[in-house]
Amino acid sequence: MLKSTVNNTRIKCGHIDQRRNYLFTTLAGTVLGSFLWSKNNVLASKMENGELHYHDPNLKFNKKLFNGKPPFERRTPDYPGHVPLYNFEKVLMFLGSSMGAFFHPEENKYIVALGESTAITPILQNLRHKMLSDPVGRTILREKPRMTSDSLNLTYLRSLPDNTIGKNYVNWLDKEHVSPDTRVAVRYIDNEELAYIYQRYRECHDFYHAITGLPIIIEGEIAVKVFEFANIGIPMSGLGALFAPLRLKSSQRQRLREIYYPWAIKNGLFSKPLINVYWEKILEKDVDEFRQEMGIQQPPDLRNMRKEYFAKKKLEKQLQGGK
């Protein structure tokens, strides 16, 4: 009987131990689950609030390399429409646009990109110095006029006397079928004032054609570019004079070499700075008087010279055919 009682007691104690282990296991699981759930909940909240960041082992190295800035991050533009470029991007733009301008000079996008990629800061700063040293140049920089069909009032210019700058200008536009509205806004030159100086040069280009009478055919463009380079110093003008003739016929190169290069260099170097001319305020001025004041002589009529050349070649062919 005593033995039976002891066995019963052991059985009861075993049941109690089993329940106790079960309770402890359940309690431990509950506490651990609550802890993990709470931790996951906190992590989820941090992720949602943007407070959780992935640890980058290269972070310290990247901060030293890029001075705390992400690579290739664009800096703040200097003016509306400005696209800041890294130096390597400027080099790539120069290489691409120079090749494009050489093989496809009729494509304005290559000419525009080449002009801005070569308009280096020291050249533009020198032009700014010239403008600041001249009362008219200072006025232009202060007022920053822009040339459009509306601002120039082409209808009014057509009503001016034939000997005026304005009438010569609008006649040249009509004859060559061009418009002042086609000039593209500067985008890739840093510094707002330097960008305006280049924009001013770009918009005045047609006036240089008008006062010299040179057409927009490639020979005329090259002659004007040499004239601009000698007077203003824009690098693209010099590059155009150097490489553009390589694609011309021998007769065209001969005309440039014997007539238009000497004229452009002489008149560009010894005339007054064209960048300081406030064209909008002298449209009613006599064009011959203006040329005399600036020290500019008109070159021979290029279109007439071409006509005479082709007429001569045609006559030679006819004479050879009659033999």
Curated annotation (Swiss-Prot):
One CC-aspect GO term: extrinsic component of mitochondrial inner membrane
Membrane topology: Peripheral membrane protein
Species assigned in the record: Candida albicans (strain SC5314 / ATCC MYA-2876) (Yeast)
UniProt xrefs under InterPro entries: Coq4, Coq4_euk
Record protein name field: Ubiquinone biosynthesis protein COQ4, mitochondrial
GO biological process: ubiquinone biosynthetic process
EC number: 4.1.1.130
Function: Lyase that catalyzes the C1-decarboxylation of 4-hydroxy-3-methoxy-5-(all-trans-polyprenyl)benzoic acid into 2-methoxy-6-(all-trans-polyprenyl)phenol during ubiquinone biosynthesis.
Any Pfam family the entry gives: Coq4
Catalytic activity as recorded in UniProt: a 4-hydroxy-3-methoxy-5-(all-trans-polyprenyl)benzoate + H(+) = a 2-methoxy-6-(all-trans-polyprenyl)phenol + CO2
Taxonomic placement: Eukaryota, Fungi, Dikarya, Ascomycota, Saccharomycotina
